[in-house]
Amino acid sequence: MIRSQLMISLFLILGHFAAGQQSEAVNNYINNYKQLAIDEMQRTGVPASIKLAQGIHETEAGRSELVLKSYNHFGIKCKTNWAGEKVYHDDDASGECFRSYQSPAASYRDHSDFLKSNQRYAFLFQLDPTDYKGWAYGLKKAGYATNIKYSQILVRLI
């Protein structure tokens, strides 16, 4: 049931973008990473539609400087508990520390683990995986991003 709802969501996303409202880069991003998003949804419960929308937004559809130099698809910063590879990038402030990965798959996996292991996101996992609006607004409420329109951006992308 969830897989069929997910596929419907993906077709809606693809149809929306195929209608010419988004760039070829967005279509390429979805095609390149949809299976990773589905796999992570099945593994952890993070909706594939949310993961793809975040990835599209955070990476400028795979073209941002940060993703090109670090495979960081979700803009996750280092913080004090990160022991992995790091890269420095200008974001809200100059020279901020971001997590760096060996592959997109590692970034997708870490994003899911980051959400699952962080108590401030725990309430999201009580939502139905098809409730992308609840997830989008919940991510903003929990402080995932500083952009005040973050949830609306995700919903619009989906």
Predicted features, each with a name:
Residues 2, 18-158:
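Catalytic cores of secreted/periplasmic lytic hydrolases that degrade extracellular macromolecules
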Residues 4-15:
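Sec-dependent N-terminal signal peptides
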